[in-house]
Amino acid sequence: RLPQDYLATQFEGGTTGAIRKNLGVEHPAKPTGWYSYSFRFTLQASAEVALSTERLEQGGVAALSITGLTGEAAPAVETDLGSVQCVRLGSGWRAYIPAAYNASAGGHTANVTVNGETFARTLTILPKDFGTVEVEPEPASTEAANAEFRNNIWPLYEQPVREKLWVGAFLCPAENYMTLVDFGQVKVTGGQQGSRSNSTRLYTIPGEPCRAPAGGVVVFAGDLALTGSTVVIDHGCGVRSYLYSLQELSVTRGQTVERGQAVGVLGEELTMDFKLGSKSVNPWPLFQTSGGLFWQEKG
């Protein structure tokens, strides 16, 4: 309430009152009141987008770092190399780009859209000769077995990514093994070249444990007609390990596992397939902390 003979004045553009002294009043009381200021800021922050490498061999993985942006909206990444999703890592965002064994050699563009602004980065894929391997004819699979595999495994390729769960090198699931068919090799049967292998088949010692390659969450554990006893572990950031032809299973869907933990028992053979989304990548660099999965690992 104002003293008698005082006026309330509102200045143009303001939302609060101010006291104006009436000079006709002698010995006015000391004015008291409060002040309120409001400001509106527009902050324009430009993101920084960096690749772990500009040249990548077939079978490899490149990391994409996105920093210097505000807000919680995830950046969007588009590339013909595969489906790529971003996750929070440290103070920024991280995505991983696969170069499948059959990715076309040459330049590939990754378009990163952040807050309506698009950044283009070029990744050059280098060809790699994975060699050939003699194999026995594989028995034809039934349509029912193929459909069962598609219904249970293919949906995992496009699941939303979870936070990064691995730390350091991955572990080969079999401690003792001999490689029968390696990643990327052309399979030769009776002198005729066939398809390339997108997985690695190992000769293993029956009864030994099958180990989790890294920390993660089991997203599938069960028996399939096409691949036998199967375990799929989600390691975060779209990286998943697919372990086929186990003798026994010792984990269930939804279970959290640690690196080296037994997820089952090995039979005579183990097929392992490491994927980023739906694209298989070379497993051996993962066991040696080599490649984009280990670039600036803490963000």
Language-model region placement:
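Zn2+-dependent peptidoglycan hydrolase active-site motif and core
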Residues: 198, 212-247, 269-272
